[in-house]
Structure formats: C-alpha cells, structure tokens
C-alpha cells in the first residue's frame, strides 16, 4: 500500500523544502510515501475564490486513482493527538488496498467535487498555518506516527 500527500503549488522556501524532504526520506524506512505537487494556477487574479477552488479541484481529481482512500487536511476535520493519529494510520495501513491519499488544498480550500471524493477529513489544529508550513508539520506527523507504531525513540509521551 502506498501513501501519498498531494499538495497544490510548489513549496517555495528552501528551508521547508529541505525539512520536508528529510521527513519524507525518513518515513520511507517504514512505508511507501511520497508527495505529489499539483502545479499552482496561473493568472488567478481574474478568478473568484470559488472559480479557483473549482479549477484546482479539477487538477486534484486528475491526480486521484480508482480505489484511492482520500483524506483531506481541512480545518473542519477531526483533530487527533499524535498517538491517536498513529493508531488511526495503523488501521488505514492495514485496511487500505490501494493508495492512502492525503490532500492539502490551495489557499481557498477545496471545491465541492473534492469534498465529495473524500472519505475523511482531519485537522492538524484549530490554528491556521501557511500552506508551506503545514506540509512540513504534516510530514513530520506521518514520520512520528510511524515511529510510534514501530517503537522508535522519536516520540515521547
């Protein structure tokens, strides 16, 4: 089973890129994990936020495969502590036959089409983070979950 993080737009700041790639590589010691970047839209000034979400939603839909289990990172999703998230991941890793796909949307969130394709929504926090920063926070939590499940020394309760 493969786990994929889909994000809209490239990561710009080099220190985030370095840290994200480090956690992705660390996570690959435990599971098949990668990050897929949907190119950011060009000429968005003429689009309403709703139109931008629709166009991004079309690109996200093209990146999905039949059988994917889709989980949105969404401010209205379920919040979990790290150990809870690890147990949640464990269940998903056992029960998902194809890909477990996490999606971080664009600046205005997700289109209804993407919400309709989702199986679940999770939230990283009640706080708002930049789209650059949440990528790093999330890949670190995936790595942390894997170390919890495998008895590694990374997480301290």
UniProtKB/Swiss-Prot annotation:
Provide the protein's localization.
Cytoplasm
One GO cellular component from the entry?
Answer: cytoplasm
Sorted UniProt keywords:
Cytoplasm, Methyltransferase, rRNA processing, S-adenosyl-L-methionine, Transferase
Which domain of life does the protein's organism represent? Bacteria
Tell me, what's a Pfam family for it?
Answer: SPOUT_MTase
Asked if the keyword Transferase belongs to this entry, the reply reads yes
UniProt-listed InterPro entries: Alpha/beta_knot_MTases (IPR029028), RlmH-like (IPR003742), tRNA_m1G_MTases_N (IPR029026)
Main subcellular location: cytoplasm
Q: Where does S-adenosyl-L-methionine bind?
A: 73, 105, 124-129
User: Which enzyme class, named as a word?
Assistant: transferase
Catalysed reactions, as listed in the record:
pseudouridine(1915) in 23S rRNA + S-adenosyl-L-methionine = N(3)-methylpseudouridine(1915) in 23S rRNA + S-adenosyl-L-homocysteine + H(+)
Q: Which GO molecular function terms does the record list?
A: rRNA (pseudouridine-N3-)-methyltransferase activity
EC assignment: the record states 2.1.1.177
Q: Which NCBIfam families match?
A: PRK00103.2-4 (NF000990)
Function, in words: Specifically methylates the pseudouridine at position 1915 (m3Psi1915) in 23S rRNA.
Give the family from UniProt. Answer: Belongs to the RNA methyltransferase RlmH family.
* HAMAP family referenced in this protein's UniProt entry, alphabetically: 23SrRNA_methyltr_H
Subunit structure, as described in the record: Homodimer.
Which PANTHER family does the entry link to? METHYLTRANSFERASE, RIBOSOMAL RNA LARGE SUBUNIT METHYLTRANSFERASE H
Protein name in UniProt: Ribosomal RNA large subunit methyltransferase H
Q: What is the lineage of its organism?
A: Bacteria, Pseudomonadati, Bacteroidota, Bacteroidia, Bacteroidales
